Swiss-Prot record:
Record region (Disordered): 15-36
GO BP: ribosomal small subunit biogenesis; translation
Known partners and oligomeric status: Part of the 30S ribosomal subunit. Contacts protein S5. The interaction surface between S4 and S5 is involved in control of translational fidelity.
HAMAP family tied to this protein: Ribosomal_uS4_B
GO cellular component entries: chloroplast; small ribosomal subunit
Function: One of the primary rRNA binding proteins, it binds directly to 16S rRNA where it nucleates assembly of the body of the 30S subunit. With S5 and S12 plays an important role in translational accuracy.
UniProt entry keywords in alphabetical sequence: Chloroplast, Plastid, Ribonucleoprotein, Ribosomal protein, RNA-binding, rRNA-binding
SMART domains membership: Ribosomal_S4 (SM01390), S4 (SM00363)
InterPro entries reported in the protein's UniProt record: Ribosomal_uS4, Ribosomal_uS4_bac-type, Ribosomal_uS4_CS, Ribosomal_uS4_N, S4_RNA-bd, S4_RNA-bd_sf
GO molecular function: rRNA binding; structural constituent of ribosome
Pfam families per UniProt: Ribosomal_S4, S4
Protein name: Small ribosomal subunit protein uS4c
């Protein structure tokens, strides 16, 4: 199954807020056209919606998500917590959380177009797994710096997670440690995803 490129507001209306998918918000009037019917939600639907929330927020394909669940199952600790840590330590997500991109798809594009350096080397793989003490910078080219500068200036200044630090003047981010579960950007029940 390929990456989702369709209408984003449809997914937001169905699944709730997904900050990584889009920075826009649907108008409140458009939500009232089709109010949620009081239909009993089955257990399967609840689990499926949690899995889809995770998939669309991080911009994963079905196969990528299954691979991450498999890796998390083999690791020590709670499978759900390890899964969320793996997803949060992806390069595209870290760029989004640092404020260098407005959405995770925007961060993917920055990485794919070779604007981002990790420890002084160009990385063009959005799923690159960042490690503690990784330094994330932009290329020295004026175009790369201008893109990041626009994103940083236009993004709302949210509280930065404690596992990341940013120097917005040098366009440099630092991964301090593995993310703690309370700083994860998406409110989700990870056990339902693993059970699915």
């Amino acid at each position: 199954m390929s990456r989702y490129r369709g209408p984003r507001f449809k997914k937001i209306r169905r699944l709730g807020t997904l900050p990584g998918l889009t920075s826009k918000r649907p108008r409140s009037g458009s939500d009232l056209k089709n109010p949620l019917r009081s239909v009993k939600r089955s257990q399967y639907r609840i689990r499926l919606e949690e899995k889809q929330k995770l998939r669309f927020h991080y911009g994963l394909t079905e196969r990528q998500l299954l691979r991450y669940v498999h890796i998390a199952g083999k690791a020590k600790g709670s499978t759900g917590q390890v899964l969320l840590q793996l997803l949060e330590m992806r390069l595209d997500n870290i760029l989004f959380r640092l404020g260098m991109a407005s959405t995770i798809p925007g961060a993917r594009q920055l990485v794919n177009h070779r604007h981002i350096l990790v420890n002084g080397r160009i990385v063009d793989i959005p799923s690159y797994r960042c490690k503690p003490r990784d330094i994330i910078t932009t290329k020295d080219k004026q175009r790369s710096k201008a893109l990041i500068q626009n994103y940083i200036a236009s993004s709302p200044h949210e509280e930065l997670p404690n596992h990341l630090t940013i120097d917005s003047f040098q366009y440099k981010g630092l991964v301090n440690q593995i993310i703690d579960s309370k700083w994860i950007g998406l409110k989700i029940n990870e056990l339902l995803v693993v059970e699915y």
